[in-house]
Amino acid sequence: MPKEKFTVITFGAPAIGNDEFAMEYGDKIDLLRVTNTSDPIPGSLQTFFGGYKQFGEHVKYHISPRISSNNHDIAMYLDYSVSEYYKAFDKAVTAGIAKALPYNKTTPGKPLVALWLHGAPGLEKRSYVPDIKRLIAEEYMGMFPSYVVMDDALDADAFYRHEDIIRLSQEVGAEYIVVCGIDGNQAKDKNYWYLILNQGVFKVDGSLVSIVTFAKKVGATGTIQATGENLLNAKEELQKHLPFVSTEQQKLICNY
């Protein structure tokens, strides 16, 4: 298979092969080597003492000292990879190479969903993980053929009463309303926390269709994995009640 059709990605500093391996396959593989600043086995040591030949493109993540003990955790690499993806994607949007997801989309014959998103103050800001609310918003937008994001930053300063949400959703012509809230609190003296996703589904007349809560335990790393698991559960619940929800894993980063 031509190397243009696939990319091989390695995490950490794996022993790819010796000089003979590199000569045989080096120009046949589109290789991306991802390492981090706290990797216990630097590639240079493998090169000098192990006889391994490093090739391909090298990307190094500068990880927070707070998670240096998790430097070989694949969940850590997933957290950082999503963060790096957003940085690269935003640059591409600025350069006009890519287009950001629209905050409203209409597909003929598909019910319009008014989407409301809430990020609780208790959700700690961690500099070494991506914007969880952005990830969740984009995943929800990928679930609905027709949607309009009514507010992606619900908080105490922009409080809407239930009747306000109903009225505003009716004004845009929505048939259904989905309210998604995320929260995360870390108990004192604990090295883990829980990422919580609340999801409420209503008809535009205000009647309740479904309301559920999902929670996943998160350590120093694993935020994206926990978010993805919550999203998969939330999507399964949506599909029980809204048959037009996309059945394809179009956007789920957790689907790896």
Describe the role of every protein-language-model region:
Residues 16, 35, 123-134, 159, ...:
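Soluble non-cytosolic domains of exported or imported proteins
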Residues 192-197:
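Short, surface-exposed coil-to-beta transition loops
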Residues 103-111, 134, 142-144, 171, ...:
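C-terminal/domain-edge helix-coil "capping" segments
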Residues 9-13, 180-181, 199:
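Short His-Asn-centered micro-motif
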Residues 13-17, 37-42, 47, 120-123, ...:
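Solvent-exposed loop/turn segments at secondary-structure junctions
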Residues 112-178, 208-211, 241-248, 254:
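N-terminal segment of the mature soluble domain
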Residues 181-185, 202-204:
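Beta-hairpin (beta-strand-turn-beta-strand) motif
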Residues 2-112:
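Serine hydrolase/lipase
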